């Protein structure tokens, strides 16, 4: 994000909080955590910041957009990112699944499970075929999804996740039907009414060679994606993006 934003002729100065060795080459790193909203506010006011582009999920789920918009001193600053409520689509897999069902957006068959409903979860696993998909409900930096080859492993890992494997993030676990096929990430900017689709990417999350092993936050990605042609993207727009933003009710 910093590398691309820095290329804009409209940018006079770019700060990255907290930044890293790579971002220091394109802007000025600032030693402020992305979730330290009061410190970010003070910095933004002192340096007359016009726009904040939020990258990570954590500050969005914790309400950075709302924090700046609800404060008279900072509401003039453009914050690129959803409200805390909107960020729940990423912050809670259970919320996202319920949202998709409610708005008739295609998604895999699933069941949400807690420690109190473990037996129901184990019974649901019996109705699925391998491999088995377990997802921690909350944020785990991209590591909260397990894909298990056998029912025995799925049962064992479900119990461990509900016992605190990912802390509070796995107090609820979403068991999901495995969908085989190609995968890509579609990025969309929206003001809540209009939208713009950004370049599509294919993310490679598995830690091992040959796309094997546990998921990470991402080992690398490639763009453009050859299979994301116009026919494919039209399906994505009509079946996923527009129902999500509710454009179908506007046009």
Question: Where in the sequence are the language-model features?
Answer:
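Conserved phosphate/anionic-ligand binding catalytic regions in large, soluble enzymes, centered on
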Residues: 212-223
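Conserved small/polar residues in nucleotide/adenosyl-binding loops
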Residues: 250-251
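ATP-binding N-terminal substructure of ATP-dependent carboxylate-amine bond-forming enzymes
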Residues: 1-84
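Short, charged, surface-exposed secondary-structure boundary motifs
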Residues: 25-26, 88-94, 208-210
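Active-site nucleotide/adenylate-binding loops and adjacent lid/helix of ATP-dependent enzymes
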Residues: 76-77, 89-174, 180-181, 193, ...
């Amino acid at each position: 994000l910093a590398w691309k934003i820095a290329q804009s002729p409209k940018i006079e100065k770019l700060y990255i909080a907290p930044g890293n060795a790579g971002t220091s080459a394109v802007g000025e790193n600032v030693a402020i955590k992305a979730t330290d909203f009061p410190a970010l506010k003070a910095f933004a006011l002192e340096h007359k910041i016009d726009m904040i582009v939020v990258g990570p999920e954590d500050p969005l789920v914790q309400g950075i957009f709302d924090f700046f918009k609800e404060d008279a001193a900072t509401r003039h600053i453009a914050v690129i990112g959803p409200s805390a409520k909107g960020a729940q689509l990423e912050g809670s897999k259970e919320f996202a699944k319920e949202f998709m069902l409610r708005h008739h957006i295609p998604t895999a068959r699933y069941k949400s499970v807690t420690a109190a409903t473990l037996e129901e979860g184990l019974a649901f696993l019996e109705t699925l075929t391998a491999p088995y998909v377990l997802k921690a409900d909350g944020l785990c930096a991209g590591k909260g999804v397990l894909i298990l080859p056998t029912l025995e492993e799925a049962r064992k890992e479900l119990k461990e996740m509900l016992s605190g494997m990912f802390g509070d993030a796995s107090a609820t676990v979403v068991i999901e039907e495995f969908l085989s096929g190609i995968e890509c990430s579609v990025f969309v900017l929206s003001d809540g009414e209009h939208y713009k689709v950004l370049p599509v990417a294919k993310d490679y999350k598995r830690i091992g060679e040959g796309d094997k092993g546990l998921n990470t936050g991402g080992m690398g990605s490639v763009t453009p994606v050859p299979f994301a042609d116009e026919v494919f993207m039209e399906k994505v727009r009509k079946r996923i993006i527009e129902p999500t933003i509710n454009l179908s009710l506007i046009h």
